[in-house]
Amino acid sequence: MIMNGRWSFNTLAIIFILLSTAALSAHFRVCEPYSDHKGRYHFGFHCPRLSDNKTYIFCCHHNNTAFKYCCNETEFQSVMQLNLTANSDSFAHNNYTALIGVWIYGFFVMVLLALDFLYYSAMNYELCRVYLEKWGLGGRWLKQARSQWHSTVQEGELNTGPGLSQQQQLHLHHHHHHHHPRHSLRGDTQSPTLLSFQTSTAW
C-alpha cells in the first residue's frame, strides 16, 4: 500500500509539472489577434507556423507598425525585453484562473478514468481477480469481498427458493379448488339421470 501511495503521489507531481509548463509556455507561443496602426484586423496564430523554423516557438511583436511573427528564445527576450525564467512565477500568479481551470479539467479526467476502471472491473470481475492475484495484489480484502459475494448469492437463492415453492403450492391449491366444483356439479347433474334410470327399471 505504501508503494501504491508513493506511485500515485509521483504521478500527480509529474502531471502538475507538465500542466504548469504547458500553460506557461503556451502563453508566449500564441500570437493573439490584433489591429495594426491602420485599423486592420489580423488573426492570431500559434508558433511555430508551418513555414517557420521549428525553433521559432515564441511570438515577437515590436509595435503596432509591425506584424507579429514567430521567433526564437534569444530574439524573444531581446525584442520583448522579458526574461522567461524570471517572469514564469509572475505569470503563474497573474493567470491563476487558467491554472485552476487546468486543474479542474485534470481532476474530472482522473475521475472519469477511475469510474471507467471501476466499471470495467465490475463487468470483468473474474479476469481482474486473476490478474490481481497474479500481481500479488489479491490480499485479504479480495478474499473477504469474494466470500461476501458468495454468501449474498447463496442467501438470495435460499430466499427465492421457498418463495417460489409457496407460490407454486398456492397456485396448485387454487387450481384444485377451481376444478373441484366441476366434479361435484357433474356428480349432481349425473345423479338425477341415474335415479330416473333406476326408477324406470324398477317399474
From Swiss-Prot:
Chain segments carrying region Disordered: 157-191
Keyword Transmembrane among UniProt keywords: yes
Residue stretches spanning the membrane: 98-118
Record Pfam families: Shisa_N
Entry GO CC: membrane
Residues annotated as glycosylated: 53, 63, 72, 83, 95
UniProt biased composition (Basic residues): 171-184
Parts of the chain on the Extracellular side: 26-97
Protein location: Membrane
Membrane topology, Cytoplasmic segments: 119-203
Membrane topology: Single-pass type I membrane protein
Low complexity: compositionally biased ranges: 161-170
InterPro entries according to UniProt: Shisa (IPR026910), Shisa_N (IPR053891)
Keywords: Glycoprotein, Membrane, Signal, Transmembrane, Transmembrane helix
Domain of life: Eukaryota
Signal peptide, first to last residue: 1-25
PANTHER family, A to Z: PROTEIN SHISA-LIKE-1, SHISA
Protein family: Belongs to the shisa family.
Protein name stated in the entry: Protein shisa-like-1a
Organism: Danio rerio
Encoding gene, per UniProt annotation: shisal1a
